[in-house]
Amino acid sequence: FFTTFDKDNDDQQNDN
């Protein structure tokens, strides 16, 4: 997911 849905972890926005 390249979206910034995980605003809490902006550092890991591209986790997948």
From Swiss-Prot:
Its main localization is secreted
Give its localization: Secreted
Q: List, alphabetically, the GO terms of the cellular component aspect.
A: extracellular region
The stated induction of this gene product is:
By infection.
One example GO MF annotation: carbohydrate binding
Q: State the UniProt keywords alphabetically.
A: Lectin, Secreted
Expression across tissues is: Hemolymph.
Keyword Plastid recorded: no
Name the job this protein performs: Binds and precipitates antigens of the parasite Echinostoma paraensei.
User: Which protein is depicted?
Assistant: Hemolymph 65 kDa lectin BG06
The organism of origin for this protein: Biomphalaria glabrata (Bloodfluke planorb)
